[in-house]
Amino acid sequence: MLEKIKETAEYIKAHVSNIPKTAIILGTGLVELVNHITDKQEIPYQEIPNFPISTVEGHSGKLIFGQLGNKRIMAMQGRFHFYEGYSMQQVTFPVRVMKALGINTLFVSNAAGGMNPEFKIGDIMIITDHINLFPEHPLRGKNYEELGPRFPEMSEAYSHRLIADAKKVAEENNIRVVEGVYVGTQGPTFETPAEYRYFHRIGGDAVGMSTVPEVIVARHGGMEVFGVSVITDLGVEGIVEKVSHEEVQKAAALAQPKMTLIMKELINKFKE
């Protein structure tokens, strides 16, 4: 794995003149942020050695390097999901490469089903913590000290200072945000009413099929992390409704302007 990480990082360095210190994974609901990146340089995943290729509708599959306001960033447009058949090492490989490139702050986004009765469709949830219910752990197997410690500490998986900054940005722009715990599951089925009840009772506020593996690997490598979910459907007891991928994308698209504004201003505001 170390050789693959090195090979991929060297390929990117050879094709990108100025590697940033900040990266963002553009999940469902944050695709519009690409339109705010200037001086762009794009590399399709299929051209990058050892990179998997995303198969999900709405995830296009390329690395974008450019300027977002006053910050130079790397944006990952299209992520890899465990339910697509990739191993956890493949799902999290891009995060390993980010660390090898010298990136030290990671912003992640996703679409999620809300389980907190206070949530509404279209809400933006700042992730304060997560519950990992994936059947395989991304750090399972041999540990390489070059990548991080055998037993990483996870008491602050999501940066407290970035959470505070994001809340300020939302307040300054009169945007409603909620906070909560994200439950990560493998998918690809949406949750049953009983699963929604269970996930909420064990402490979850929203549930989705991504993010947790990437965050674990980022923290393993010592990166600072900020995460945000757009609530695209509700699994609140008594009002669970049928949901489809198309409906999730539609709800995420409606929330994009608010989510984009928060992320853009937060990235510009924080100190690397």
Locations of regions flagged by a protein language model:
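Generic non-transmembrane alpha-helical segments
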Residues: 11, 15, 161, 165-176, ...
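Non-catalytic positions within long, well-ordered alpha-helices that form the structural scaffold/packing
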Residues: 99-100, 200, 219
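Short acidic/polar active-site loop segments enriched in Thr and Asp
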Residues: 104-105, 205, 224
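Metal-dependent peptidase/peptidase-like ectodomains
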Residues: 143-182
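Active-site/ligand-binding-proximal alpha/beta "capping" segment
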Residues: 169-205
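His/Asp/Glu-rich mid-to-C-terminal helical/loop segments that flank catalytic regions of hydrolases
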Residues: 236-272
